[in-house]
């Protein structure tokens, strides 16, 4: 939900590409409630919802990727989305809970990778550790032994990138079979 702290409660809202090339959500009065907020420099932008659920904004004659929803997660993890954390820069992507079942604004819980030491998946409550997975052991988080047997947890990978960023991603689509 792009505008979760200012949700539109009727059908008057609209998503469009603004004059400066940004993806924006407008209310019925034409006020900008949310923007992709990237510096594009010209209005040759296109938006596309990819097959894997990633909303992307492309700009310029070559269609360069300038923004993508998978780098701005809200409350739901989608396969091929990446949660990352960089201890050097402090930059991290987190999933954030809703305030309540009827209020989509940012709530008290967040989830993501801990940027310090060996990567671990954490759930924080108001910024304080609430739960942790245990360190990444190369094939699973050692605090979640059922990762090997759970169809919902198989296929995750944690990788360290050249800039020190640790990234959690689902490297294969889970296949759920009825038996």
What is each residue range found by the language model?
Residues 1-179:
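Beta-rich ligand-binding surfaces for carbohydrates and other polyanions
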């Amino acid at each position: 939900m792009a505008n979760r702290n200012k949700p539109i409660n009727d059908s008057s809202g609209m998503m469009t590409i603004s004059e400066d090339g940004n993806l924006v959500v407008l209310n019925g009065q034409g006020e900008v409630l949310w923007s992709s907020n990237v510096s594009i420099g010209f209005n040759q932008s296109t938006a596309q919802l990819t097959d894997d659920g990633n909303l992307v904004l492309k700009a310029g004659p070559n269609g360069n990727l300038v923004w993508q929803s998978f780098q701005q997660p809200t409350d739901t993890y989608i396969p091929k989305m990446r949660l990352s954390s960089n201890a050097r820069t402090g930059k991290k992507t987190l999933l954030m809970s809703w305030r309540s079942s009827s209020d989509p604004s940012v709530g008290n819980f967040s989830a993501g990778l801990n940027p310090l030491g060996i990567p671990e998946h954490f759930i924080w409550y108001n910024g304080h550790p609430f739960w942790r997975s245990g360190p990444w052991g190369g094939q699973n988080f050692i605090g979640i032994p059922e990762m090997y047997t759970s169809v919902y947890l198989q296929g995750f990978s944690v990788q360290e990138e050249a800039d020190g960023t640790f990234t959690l991603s689902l490297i294969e689509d889970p296949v759920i079979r009825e038996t």
